[in-house]
C-alpha cells in the first residue's frame, strides 16, 4: 500500500470541480443497464466502487463504452438482464451489492454476489429481511457476503426501515419496480433520495410524501442523457480545508446541492463558514451549482439524530478538524460508522490521538476537544478512503509532516484527491 506525505499549508486558493457523485453514478449505472436505449453520462464517477457497478451490469448483459471525451455510454437491455456466467464481484462497494440485490431478486435466474475482505465484513441482513417479505429468496454467509440470490416473483410491501440507510431504501424500491403492486418505504429519519429521483428520471412511477416514498411495479425504464453533479461528499474535504484558513478563496464548480446531501454546508455555516451560491440549476431532479465559502473561525457543534444520518459520509472529516474549532465537535447516534469500510469511530479516535488530540470515544460517536494544536504523525487509513482523505485535511493545519499510510485507498471514491489537493494548497 502507498504512503503519502502531507505538509502543513498556509492557505487554500483556486477553483475545483469534482468527479461525478458516487451515489448518483451507482444508481444511474444500474437503471441505465435496465433501460431501453443507450444512456450517455458526462462526469460519471471515476472511483473503483462505481466501476464495480458498471462491471456487474456488463456481466448481466449491458454494454458499457468509455468514449475518448470522457462520456460513458450504457446500452441497456430493455429489462431483459441475462444470468452472469460467474460471480458478480462488487469489490469494496456496499452500494453495488445492496442495491443490485434488489434488482436481482426479481429476475428469472439465480445470482451470486461477492466482495473484497472489507465488504465481506459489512452487514447484509438489513436488505435480506425486506426482500424476503416481498417473496425474495436470498441467502447470506452468516449475515454477510457472499450473497446467493434466487430469482423470484415479488409482491409489493409497505416497509419501515429499522436503520437510516439510503442503500436499503434504494434496494427495496428497485425491487419494487419489478414487483406486483405499489411498494412503499417509510423512514423515521429521511436519508438521501437519489434512488427515488433516479427511478423517476428513468421513467418509473414514483410518489414522495415527506418521509414516505412509493414506486409502482412493472416499470419500463428509458435511457437518459445526463451530466452527473460533482460529488459533494468529495467536495466536503475541500470545504472543510477551506474553512480552516481565514483568507482562503476556493470556488466549487458544478457540485451536487441536493438538500438531502447538502447538510455539510449547513453545518459549516452554523460554525461560521457561510457558503455563497453563485449559480444553481436542476438536472433530472437533482440540484447542482457553483459556490464559494466565506471562511471564519469555526465555533464547533454537536451532531446527533437526523443530522448524523444526513452527514454519515462527512462525519470523519468533521471529526478530524474538530480540534481546530473553538469549542470542539461531538458526534452521537453514529453507530453506523462502526460498520463502514472500517470502524470509523475507533479509527478516527486512534488517529486523532496519534496527532496529539484529546478525544473521547463513545459507543455511538465521539467528542473532540476544541482549541487544540495537532502535530504531524503516521496515520493508518485501514484501507478506508474517507479516513485517508479526512486526515490529509487535518494535516494541513498540523505542526510538521503527516504520513498517510495506505493512501491509495482514495481510488475507491476519488482517485484524483491528492492531485487536486496539491493544486489548491499554498505552503
Swiss-Prot record:
Keywords: Amino-acid biosynthesis, Aromatic amino acid biosynthesis, Cytoplasm, Transferase. Its main location: cytoplasm. It catalyses: 3-phosphoshikimate + phosphoenolpyruvate = 5-O-(1-carboxyvinyl)-3-phosphoshikimate + phosphate. The active site is at residue 313. One of its GO terms (cellular component) is cytoplasm. GO terms for biological process: amino acid biosynthetic process; aromatic amino acid family biosynthetic process; chorismate biosynthetic process. Belongs to the EPSP synthase family. This is 3-phosphoshikimate 1-carboxyvinyltransferase. It comes from Koribacter versatilis (strain Ellin345). The lineage of its organism: Bacteria, Pseudomonadati, Acidobacteriota, Terriglobia, Terriglobales.
